[in-house]
């Protein structure tokens, strides 16, 4: 299974009342697949999965699937710290005809490496849906070790990993221990180029909401052997990469999309909207990069109001 190069970790739009805005989700999904995204990851960290109900997630999977209409991969965030829940959600995503599932390392209960292996193996054996593992120890409290990844990669449906530990030695070891067809995706926009240099496949991106085509150019330049050009793209985009993590993701990206006119709404509690100095820094970076001149979101807002 080839998920592509640029996979957007899609935000979940909410109404002013805090309910899911499925109409805006469909619009955003359509926009993303025509602006550089090979795939969409729905209901991941950026999609605020911890504060969504399963029923909200299932409906969002369906809405995004229909909006994409086969033009890009749709990967469902069906991970959980309950193995049983993760299996049930993954089966549902398969029934909905999605292209893959993102399985986060179980959080809070801190299983051992043996427990992690059994967790992911059980999910893999319960469904034919291709699985992308998701290692993000800064949020989960436990890290999936390269040796465990290599063992899991022997299972037919476990085809890739989103690596968000920020540890390049771990990425190197995963690449060394896994077959070449096993996909390694950067979980941080700013580490896309370094991970490409270690045999990575692409990125699960937040910034691609705003600069999808540029990220495609970065990765394609590297793939063509034009490493200097890839570095130029990386350095040009680097201030945006950092600004989008000035506070907890997805708070900054939702603020940026609202500035562009998208009706994505605020984050759900316990997250709070971007304010004060952070908001000013983000706005300045967007202005300097010409991203507030984008008319797509504002045009939709005007059309909706009329």
Swiss-Prot record:
Alphabetic keyword roster: Amino-acid biosynthesis, Cytoplasm, Diaminopimelate biosynthesis, Lyase, Lysine biosynthesis, Schiff base
Reaction catalysis annotation: L-aspartate 4-semialdehyde + pyruvate = (2S,4S)-4-hydroxy-2,3,4,5-tetrahydrodipicolinate + H2O + H(+)
- Name the gene: dapA
Chief subcellular location: cytoplasm
Q: Which GO terms describe its cellular component?
A: cytosol
Location comes to:
Cytoplasm
Instruction: State the name under which the record lists this protein.
Output: 4-hydroxy-tetrahydrodipicolinate synthase
Instruction: List the InterPro entries.
Output: Aldolase_TIM, DapA, DapA-like, Schiff_base-form_aldolases_AS, Schiff_base-form_aldolases_CS
- Database matches in PROSITE patterns: DHDPS_1, DHDPS_2
The entry sums up its family as follows: Belongs to the DapA family.
Q: How does it assemble?
A: Homotetramer; dimer of dimers.
Annotated site location: Part of a proton relay during catalysis: 45, 108
Q: Name one GO biological process term.
A: lysine biosynthetic process via diaminopimelate
- EC main class here is lyase
Natural source organism: Synechococcus sp. (strain JA-3-3Ab)
Where, in this chain's numbering, is pyruvate bound? Answer: 46, 204
Which PANTHER family does this UniProt record tie to the protein?
A: 4-HYDROXY-2-OXOGLUTARATE ALDOLASE, MITOCHONDRIAL, DIHYDRODIPICOLINATE SYNTHASE
- Molecular function terms, GO-annotated: 4-hydroxy-tetrahydrodipicolinate synthase activity
The entry's active site is 134 (proton donor/acceptor), 162 (schiff-base intermediate with substrate)
Identify the metabolic or biological route this protein is part of. Answer: Amino-acid biosynthesis; L-lysine biosynthesis via DAP pathway; (S)-tetrahydrodipicolinate from L-aspartate: step 3/4
Biological role: Catalyzes the condensation of (S)-aspartate-beta-semialdehyde [(S)-ASA] and pyruvate to 4-hydroxy-tetrahydrodipicolinate (HTPA).
């Amino acid at each position: 299974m080839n998920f592509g190069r640029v996979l957007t970790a899609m935000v979940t739009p909410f109404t002013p009342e805090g309910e899911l805005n499925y109409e805006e989700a469909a619009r955003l999904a359509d926009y993303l697949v025509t602006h550089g995204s090979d795939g969409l990851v729905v209901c991941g960290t950026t999609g605020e999965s911890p504060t969504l109900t399963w029923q909200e997630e299932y409906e969002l999977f369906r809405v995004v699937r229909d909006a994409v209409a086969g033009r890009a991969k749709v990967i469902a965030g069906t991970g959980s710290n309950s193995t049983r829940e993760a299996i049930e959600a993954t089966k549902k995503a398969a029934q909905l005809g999605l292209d893959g599932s993102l399985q986060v390392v179980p959080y809070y209960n801190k299983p051992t490496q043996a427990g992690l292996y059994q967790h992911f193996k059980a999910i893999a054996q319960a469904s034919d849906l291709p699985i992308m593992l998701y290692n993000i120890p800064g949020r989960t409290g436990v890290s999936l070790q390269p040796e465990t990844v290599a063992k899991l990669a022997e299972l037919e449906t476990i085809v890739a990993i989103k690596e968000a530990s920020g540890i390049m030695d771990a990425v190197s070891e995963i690449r060394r221990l896994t077959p070449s067809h096993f996909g390694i995706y950067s979980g941080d926009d700013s580490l896309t180029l370094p991970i490409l240099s270690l045999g990575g496949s692409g990125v699960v991106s937040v910034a691609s909401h705003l600069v999808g085509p540029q990220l495609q150019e970065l990765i394609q330049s590297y793939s063509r052997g034009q490493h200097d050009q890839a570095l130029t793209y990386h350095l040009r985009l680097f201030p945006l990469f950092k600004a989008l993590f000035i506070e907890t993701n997805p708070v900054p990206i939702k603020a940026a999309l609202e500035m562009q006119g998208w009706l994505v709404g605020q984050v759900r509690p316990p997250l709070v909207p971007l304010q004060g100095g952070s908001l000013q820094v983000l706005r300045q970076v967007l202005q300097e990069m010409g991203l507030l001149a984008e008319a797509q979101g504002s045009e939709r807002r005007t059309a909706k109001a009329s």
